[in-house]
Structures are given as C-alpha cells and as structure tokens.
Amino acid sequence: MTDRRGLLIILSSPSGAGKSTLARRLMSWDPGLKFSVSATTRAPRPGEEHGREYYFLSEDQFKGQVRRGEMLEHAHVFGNFYGSPAGPVRDTIEAGQDVLFDVDWQGEIQIRNSDLGKHALSIFILPPSIKELRRRLESRGQDSAEVISRRMLKSWDEISHWGYYDYVLINDDLDATEERLKTIVSAERMRRIQQPALQEHVRKLQSEFEDLS
C-alpha cells in the first residue's frame, strides 16, 4: 500500500485564461504528475501512438466502454467521441500519483459523479477581465477574428459554471496564480481519504497504547 493515494486534478477555464500554461508549470513542478490520456474515435494523425497521445478506439469499442461505466467522462466533439478511460486513471492514483485533467465543466461534473469522484480536486481559472481575456486571445496570433469571436462567446458559458468547482483562482498574475495552485494541490494531498496508510498507523498506535496497560 502506498503512503498516498493520487488526486484527480481537474483544471478548467475559458480559452485564454492561462489554464494550459498553468498545467505545464504544475507538471514541471512535479514531474511525477501524469496528464490524463484520453480515448478517441478519430483516426490517428502522423506520429501519434496508441496510449501516448490518445487511446484510439473504434466507435463500437468506445460506446461499449461507456455502457460498461469504463469512462470517467465523455463527449461528442466535431463528429468524434472523446473520453477519459477509468482504468489507467485508477491504476495511477492507486500507485500514489496524481492525474491532471484538462476538461470543461461538463467533464468536471461527470468525473465528480464517478466512483473516483471522492478523489477529485477541481480548480477553475478566471481571467481578471473580459477585456484582458480578448487581449490574450488576440496576442496569441493563432486564430482569425471569427474564431476569436466564437471563443469569446463560448467563454461565458464556461465562466457561468464556476460555482461547480472546489477552488476558483483569478489569474491576474501568472506567477502568483501558480503559487496558489501549488499550495492547493499540496494541501489537498494531505486529505485523510488520500492517505490510505493512516488507518494502519492508527491501529499500530492503538496496539502500542494497549500494551501499556
């Protein structure tokens, strides 16, 4: 038995709020943290490997896993199915390692309602303002004005569900937000349910106490 059970760390935010950067920093801070590998029904792209970028499944295989309750969360996006297989996540957290999820609020709810939900830690990242959110999207130089407008419209749908999350951070300073994020993760790792070895330790203390009498 490991001293610690891993967490399911869920990071969500509207596009441009800094979630991806914070996720990279979190994984740099703790190289043992694993990023969740999703399953998908889309075809592999050149250079992609099964089990590394994605678990590539047929539609029948994917739907079968959903029916059997083997997906923590799943969604249909642009004609393909995507989801988080429960098996690899369960194995990872039982080995004492955390798993990081980049999902939206709907994925957060599904994970929270799964049998692993009691080990979930969900964090929502807010921008300091809508004006700053647009500025960040435009400064990337990656998207057309039309795509940016679509992302801005979707951002309110994401932001409006902030109340589903355990913690909400306003990312007005990236370094400060990173430190707050690490503080949250460090504290949540110490939750009683995340320390399976505690029960045996308490039994040992009880036995020692009884030997005194």
UniProtKB/Swiss-Prot annotation:
It comes from the Bacteria. It holds the Pfam family Guanylate_kin. Essential for recycling GMP and indirectly, cGMP. InterPro entries: GK/Ca_channel_bsu, Guanylate_kin-like_dom, Guanylate_kinase, Guanylate_kinase_CS, P-loop_NTPase. PANTHER family: GUANYLATE KINASE (PTHR23117:SF13), GUANYLATE KINASE-RELATED (PTHR23117). Its main location: cytoplasm. Keywords: ATP-binding, Cytoplasm, Kinase, Nucleotide-binding, Transferase. It is an enzyme of class 2 (transferase). The lineage of its organism: Bacteria, Pseudomonadati, Pseudomonadota, Alphaproteobacteria, Rhodobacterales. PROSITE patterns: GUANYLATE_KINASE_1, GUANYLATE_KINASE_2. Its EC number is 2.7.4.8. It catalyses: GMP + ATP = GDP + ADP. It comes from Ruegeria pomeroyi (strain ATCC 700808 / DSM 15171 / DSS-3). Residues 6-186 form the Guanylate kinase-like domain. Coiled coil: none annotated. GO terms for cellular component: cytosol. Belongs to the guanylate kinase family. ATP binds at S13, P14, S15, G16, A17, G18, K19, S20. This is Guanylate kinase. GO terms for molecular function: ATP binding; guanylate kinase activity. It is found in: Cytoplasm.
